[in-house]
Swiss-Prot record:
This is Prolactin. One of its GO terms (cellular component) is extracellular space. The modification Phosphoserine is found at S56, S64, S120. Belongs to the somatotropin/prolactin family. Disulfide bonds join C34-C41, C88-C204, C221-C229. InterPro entries: 4_helix_cytokine-like_core, Somatotropin/Prolactin, Somatotropin_CS. Keywords: Disulfide bond, Glycoprotein, Hormone, Lactation, Phosphoprotein, Secreted, Signal. Glycans are attached at N61. Residues 1-30 form the signal peptide. The keyword Magnesium does not apply.
Length: 229
């Protein structure tokens, strides 16, 4: 009996910690960088990075959950996992594949790369939401996550623009991004082809959100803590 009580207490404690962490992410993610109507609002670089790291991690978690839910609901028995994943539309941006590669890139270049990846997802995320809404019996769990990711991607982009403005204030970065042309694939009449297009897009979103999450943690350590972390 004591062992069961101990196990139950441990499970409840873990659940409380997970809920607390989720509420923290949602709270921080919902805060604008500056309050509406604020004049000469100044936010420290450290605080900007703190928010960006929490937000990027939140987006990656949502992306992973959405991919897993889509896979479970639509991909089972269709052989999607055995198909070669098509090249992601952001592949042309030559993002580093791991931490070791990212460490070789100058921080200003890595910051601008993050901006480009985030901008490259504005259009596909907008259309992802609209196309999921149009799906027969659109699952609320997937739709709500798509809506949330689209909104938080905009917030993260806003925060990253402020970070770049503080790190390299004299340089105006061109709004370079990779163009997405996958909308026709999401609207195909053939169900298998259409669902695989969704599967591929969600796979790419999970991949890119994971990269951004890792890049931001590396940059926070390098810029805010002078690599002493």
């Amino acid at each position: 009996m004591d062992k069961k009580r101990s196990s139950l207490k441990g499970s409840l404690l873990l659940l409380l910690l997970l809920v607390s962490d989720l509420l923290l992410c949602k709270s921080v993610a919902s805060l604008p960088i500056c309050p509406s109507g604020a004049v000469n609002c100044q936010v420290s670089l450290r605080e900007l990075f703190d928010r960006a790291v929490i937000l990027s991690h939140y987006i990656h978690n949502l992306s992973s959950e959405m991919f897993n839910e889509f896979d479970k609901r639509y991909a089972q028995g269709r052989g999607f996992v055995t198909k070669a994943i098509n090249s992601c539309h952001t592949s042309s941006l030559s993002t580093p594949e791991d931490k070791e590669q990212a460490q070789q890139i100058h921080h200003e270049d890595l910051l601008n790369l993050i901006l480009r990846v985030l901008r490259s997802w504005n259009d596909p995320l907008y259309h992802l939401v609209s196309e999921v809404r149009g799906m027969q019996e659109a699952p609320e769990a997937i739709l709500s996550k798509a809506i949330e990711i689209e909104e938080q991607n905009r917030r993260l982009l806003e925060g990253m623009e402020k970070i770049v403005g503080q790190v390299q204030p004299r340089i105006k970065e061109n709004e370079v991004y990779s163009v997405w042309s996958g909308l026709p694939s999401l609207q195909m009449a053939d169900e298998d082809s259409r669902l695989f297009a969704f599967y591929n897009l969600l796979h790419c979103l999970r991949r890119d959100s994971h990269k951004i999450d890792n890049y931001l943690k590396l940059l926070k350590c390098r810029i805010v803590y002078d690599s002493n972390c």
